[in-house]
A protein has these predicted regions:
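Conserved beta-strand elements of the Class I
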Residues: 26-28
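Short alpha-helical
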Residues: 33, 97-98, 117
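Active-site rim beta-loop-alpha module in soluble metabolic enzymes
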Residues: 31-92
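Short acidic active-site motifs
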Residues: 13, 76-77, 99
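C-terminal helical cap(s) of enzyme catalytic domains, especially alpha/beta-barrels
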Residues: 123-130
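Short, acidic/small-residue loops that bind anionic groups at enzyme active sites
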Residues: 1-21, 103-122
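Extended, histidine- and acidic-residue-enriched regions that form the cofactor-binding/catalytic faces
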Residues: 80, 85-109, 125
Length: 130
């Protein structure tokens, strides 16, 4: 289907937001198998030269509710991406949202939750009359 209304993808909005926070960004994926899909989007967007890396935490969406395991792995991934040169990190799954602030505090770099980024961009478009 086609529409004349704007369509904002959460991954794209998350990456665009991350690019305003520094030169290079990283992505935290849920599974290794998610990375190829993310890379296709990053390449299509033309921003692969600014990707510091992507790390998978090895948990399917259903297991993200295990707070201890998820938070530990996400913090480890964010710190590794920071050490790889990322100035900010994008969460690769909307199911990670509840961990954003704690991961950001532990890693010491901005962490972008892509659904929040998309909502803010959509609100901006509305306010600008687009």
């Amino acid at each position: 289907e086609t529409t004349r209304k704007p369509v904002l993808g959460i991954m794209e909005c998350g990456i665009f937001t991350a690019l305003t926070l520094g030169q290079r960004f990283g992505v935290i994926a849920i599974l290794q198998s998610s990375i190829a899909r993310h890379l296709r989007t990053i390449i299509t967007m033309g921003v692969q030269s600014r990707l510091a890396g992507e790390r998978a935490i090895g948990l399917p969406v259903i297991e993200l509710s295990d707070e201890s395991k998820t938070l530990t792995r996400m913090i480890g991934a964010a710190k590794a991406l920071r050490d790889d040169g990322a100035d900010s990190v994008v969460m690769g799954c909307a199911g990670m949202a509840q961990y954003r602030k704690r991961v950001e505090q532990a890693a010491g770099i901005p962490v972008v939750e892509p659904t929040q980024a998309a909502v803010v961009m959509a609100l901006g478009r509305v306010r600008l009359g687009w």
